[in-house]
Each structure stands twice: as C-alpha cells, then as structure tokens.
Amino acid sequence: YTNQRMWFYKDGQLLVDTLVVTGNTSKDMGSPVGIFALYYKETNAILKGEDYKTPVDFWMPFYGGVGIHDAKWRSEFGGNLYQSSGSHGCINTPWANAKTIYENIDAGTPIVCYNAGTNLGQGTQAYEQPAETRNVEEELAGTADASSAGTDSTGTTDNTTADGAGDTAS
C-alpha cells in the first residue's frame, strides 16, 4: 500500500490506474494485505462505524467491512496521506474511478492487496510495476478465492511507496 495506487483490469485491459488513500497506519487501521474476492457491490450505501456515518455512491466490499469506495470528501489522493489521514481500512478512490470500477466489476472478482516487499512465500518480491507486467493469474493460482472467483476482472491495490507505482489495492 505504500505506493497508494490501484489498477483495475477487465478482460486483460487496464481500465483504471489511479492514486488512492488506504487505511490510516498511525491509528493502527492499515488496509488488509492478501488475495480476496469482491463480496458484492452497492450504490448509495452508508458506511457506519463507531465514530462515523458516511454516505458513498459506490461501495465494493471485499474483506469484512473493508472495501473500495468513492471518497468525494477528499481533494487529494496518494502520497503519504494514509499515514496520518487515511481511512478506517477501506480503499478511498476518486469518484470517477470508483464509478468506472463499479460499472465493470462483478461479485467474485479477485482483489489483490499488497505492500512493496511483501513476502509471498517464494522470497521477498517488491512489486513496483503495474500488474500487466506480471502474470496475476499465476499469483492467484492455488488460492481458495481464485478457484471460486471469475477471472474476467482483477482489482489490485498497491501500498508501496509514494512513487506512483502500483494500485491493485496496495
């Protein structure tokens, strides 16, 4: 998530490449790392927590109460914002990009969230290039989510460094 970037692919085509804001690490609310599948999608949702009640136009949960959604209240995305003014774990996305993803994603779509330098079991791999330069299907092979989810679309967020290199959900 250090790159604060998300890429969204459908049928092998890159549809979205955007900066995002992920979970607030200074408050111990960092976004989850792993391979997930989209639960469902919903418009005009109200996200609720102990200290907030926030309406969003596009809600796409993939890990408990964590998901991808628009963040109309933000004027900036990317950089180090997540360290002090990040989300409660969700992937805050610019409105137009959240809309594009919403219109093209289906329940069961794999979502890959990672930090640069994450150990994936085969040594440490720093992913600093967009997913189209890697074989994402090979990375998903063998996971429970991948075997039950469709492979038409892949949402990915990258939380590596603020150099703008990745957004599969990092």
Task: Give residue spans per PLM region.
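Exported/periplasmic cell-wall-interacting domains
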Residues: 30-35, 42-170
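N-terminal post-signal-peptidase region of extra-cytosolic proteins
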Residues: 19-25, 40-49
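Cell wall/extracellular polymer interaction/catalysis modules
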Residues: 1-28
